[in-house]
Amino acid sequence: MSAAPRIGILGAGGRMGRTLIQAVQQAGYQLAAAVERPESSLVGTDAGELAGIGSVGVKVSGSLADVLKDCDVIIDFTAPAATAQHLKLCREAGVAMVIGTTGMSDEQKAELDEAATHIPVVYAANYSVGVNVSIKLLELAAKVFGDTVDIEVIEAHHRHKVDAPSGTALMMGEAIADTLGRNLKEVAVYGREGHTGPRDRQTIGFETIRGGDIVGEHTVMFIGEGERVEVTHKATNRMNFAAGAVRAAAWVVGREARKYDMKDVLGLNDVQV
C-alpha cells in the first residue's frame, strides 16, 4: 500500500495504548482512531493529549464499530475476551489486525485462526525486533545442542502483569521445542517445589519473576556439562514493542488473508538456521 496506513489503536488509555499512539506519530503514519471502553472517562479526550504528545485531532471513541470505516488496520493490545470481540468486528468490516494480546485460551486462539482466513492478522506475543532476533538465535542454539543440554527459560516483568509465564517466554519455549521435535505442552515444567527428583533432560523449565516496574526480561539457558550458554533480552521501555507493532501494521495492510507473525514482518522466516 503506497499511502500511509490509517491505524486505529485499541485500549488507548493503557500504558501500551499511549505508547502506541506515540509510535504511530513518530513513524509518520496516520492515527485514524483511538478506542477505549464505552464507560471510560477518557472517551472524548484528544488521543494525542492522552499520550502526552499534544493535540492530534483524534478523539478517543467508546465504540470500535463506529470508527472501523476510518481504519485500514487495528492494533490490539487489550485483554483476551475483548480481543475476541474485536476480531469479530474487524472480520465483518474487512479490516486487518495486529494483535499483541497475551493469555489467550486455546479456544480464543482458534477463533483468531478462523478470523485470519478472512482478514490478514499479525499475531505475536512480542513485537520487539530484538526479541524476534533472539528467538532465531534460540532456534540455532537448540539445533546445535540438541539433546545434550538442559534448557531453562527465566522471565521477569512488572508487578501488574496478570499472566504467567509471559507470552514471550512461551513463544521462546515453542520455538525451542519445535526445533527439537518436542511438544511444549508435554515437556514444559512450570516452577519447581519440594522433592522433584532428577531433572528430565527432555523437559523445558520455566521460572517467573514479578516485581516493581520491570518492563520485560527473558533469559534462556542451555546448560551442559562444564559450560552454559545464555541468550538474554532486556527491554528498558515499551517503545520498542510499540514501534514493532506499528511496523507490523504498516506491513500487513493489503496482504492476503492469513495469520502472520513478527518473523514474517521482519523477513526472519527466510533466514535458515
From Swiss-Prot:
Binding site for NAD(+): 11-16, 36, 100-102, 124-127
Parts forming coiled coils: none
Pathway: Amino-acid biosynthesis; L-lysine biosynthesis via DAP pathway; (S)-tetrahydrodipicolinate from L-aspartate: step 4/4
Molecular function (Gene Ontology), one example: oxidoreductase activity, acting on CH or CH2 groups, NAD or NADP as acceptor
Localisation: Cytoplasm
Reaction catalysis annotation: (S)-2,3,4,5-tetrahydrodipicolinate + NAD(+) + H2O = (2S,4S)-4-hydroxy-2,3,4,5-tetrahydrodipicolinate + NADH + H(+); (S)-2,3,4,5-tetrahydrodipicolinate + NADP(+) + H2O = (2S,4S)-4-hydroxy-2,3,4,5-tetrahydrodipicolinate + NADPH + H(+)
Keyword NAD in record: yes
EC number annotated for this UniProt entry: 1.17.1.8
Residues where NADP(+) binds: 37
CDD domains: DHDPR_N (cd02274)
Active-site residues, as the UniProt record annotates them: 157 (proton donor/acceptor), 161 (proton donor)
Pfam families reported for this sequence: DapB_C, DapB_N
BP terms from Gene Ontology: diaminopimelate biosynthetic process; lysine biosynthetic process via diaminopimelate
Family the entry assigns: Belongs to the DapB family.
HAMAP family the UniProt entry points to: DapB
Described purpose of this protein according to its UniProt entry: Catalyzes the conversion of 4-hydroxy-tetrahydrodipicolinate (HTPA) to tetrahydrodipicolinate.
Protein name as it appears in the record: 4-hydroxy-tetrahydrodipicolinate reductase
Organism of derivation: Acinetobacter baumannii (strain SDF)
